[in-house]
């Protein structure tokens, strides 16, 4: 974890202190270790996220220590808990306000599939309104599972180019907009 990760990218090494490579690999490395999370907590998964951010698990080791409470200053949203149909347009609006490139982690059974709340008022999976990058299983998931999701997202950021990421997200959003016209507020 560090500059030694750059040695896995195409380029030349000049001694121990200098690494030559392309700019995109440096940007991908930097972006993967400087995520600004926006926790959207509505249930018990939010409590597990709080313990993940505290000293016992220390999410700061992975570069996501600064939670942002303004979507305009965040690039990763963690959906933690049950999302109702009344909340869905608000969540989508928050996602649209986030800085590019933006990432989504669906934490827990309620956010991923509606959980035990299979009712008319609960959205059966946040992937119906947002392009989810990583799913975290559990009810509630343990802090280790949330950290594992963060590591999976970092791996994805290191391997996927910026343009490929942009195209993937735009395609997912277009599909979501076509499927869920009543949920999307513009």
Curated annotation (Swiss-Prot):
Pfam families for the chain: Oxidored_q6
InterPro entries, sorted: NADH_UbQ_OxRdtase-like_20kDa (IPR006137), NADH_UQ_OxRdtase_20Kd_su (IPR006138)
Source domain of life: Bacteria
Record's GO cellular component terms: plasma membrane; respiratory chain complex I
GO terms, molecular function: 4 iron, 4 sulfur cluster binding; iron ion binding; NADH dehydrogenase (ubiquinone) activity; NADH:ubiquinone reductase (non-electrogenic) activity; quinone binding
Alphabetical keyword list: 4Fe-4S, Cell inner membrane, Cell membrane, Iron, Iron-sulfur, Membrane, Metal-binding, NAD, Quinone, Translocase, Transport, Ubiquinone
Compartments it resides in: Cell inner membrane
Uppermost EC category: translocase
GO biological process, one term: aerobic respiration
Annotated catalysed reactions: a quinone + NADH + 5 H(+)(in) = a quinol + NAD(+) + 4 H(+)(out)
Binding residues annotated for [4Fe-4S] cluster, in chain numbering: 44-45, 110, 139
Required cofactor(s): [4Fe-4S] cluster
PROSITE patterns xrefs: COMPLEX1_20K (PS01150)
E.C. number: 7.1.1.-
Cofactor mode of binding and number, as noted: Binds 1 [4Fe-4S] cluster.
Function: NDH-1 shuttles electrons from NADH, via FMN and iron-sulfur (Fe-S) centers, to quinones in the respiratory chain. The immediate electron acceptor for the enzyme in this species is believed to be ubiquinone. Couples the redox reaction to proton translocation (for every two electrons transferred, four hydrogen ions are translocated across the cytoplasmic membrane), and thus conserves the redox energy in a proton gradient.
Quaternary structure and interacting proteins, as annotated: NDH-1 is composed of 14 different subunits. Subunits NuoB, C, D, E, F, and G constitute the peripheral sector of the complex.
HAMAP family cross-referenced by the UniProt entry: NDH1_NuoB
Family: Belongs to the complex I 20 kDa subunit family.
Protein name in UniProt: NADH-quinone oxidoreductase subunit B
Protein's organism: Leptospira interrogans serogroup Icterohaemorrhagiae serovar Lai (strain 56601)
Record gene name: nuoB
């Amino acid at each position: 974890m560090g500059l030694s990760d750059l040695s896995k990218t195409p380029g030349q090494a000049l001694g121990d202190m200098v690494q030559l490579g392309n700019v995109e690999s440096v940007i991908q490395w930097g972006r993967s270790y400087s995520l600004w999370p926006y926790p959207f907590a509505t249930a018990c998964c939010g409590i597990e996220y709080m313990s993940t951010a505290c000293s016992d698990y220390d999410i700061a080791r992975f570069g996501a220590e600064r939670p942002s409470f303004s979507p305009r200053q965040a690039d990763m949203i963690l959906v933690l808990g049950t999302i109702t149909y009344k909340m869905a347009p608000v969540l989508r609006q928050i996602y649209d306000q986030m800085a590019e490139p933006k990432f989504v982690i669906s934490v827990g059974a309620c956010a991923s599939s509606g959980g035990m709340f299979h009712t008319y008022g609960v959205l059966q999976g946040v992937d119906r309104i947002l392009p989810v990058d990583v799913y975290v299983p559990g009810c509630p998931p343990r802090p280790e599972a949330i950290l594992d999701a963060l590591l999976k997202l970092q791996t994805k950021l290191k391997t996927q180019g910026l343009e490929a990421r942009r195209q993937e997200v735009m395609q997912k959003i277009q599909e979501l907009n076509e499927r869920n016209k009543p949920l999307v507020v513009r």
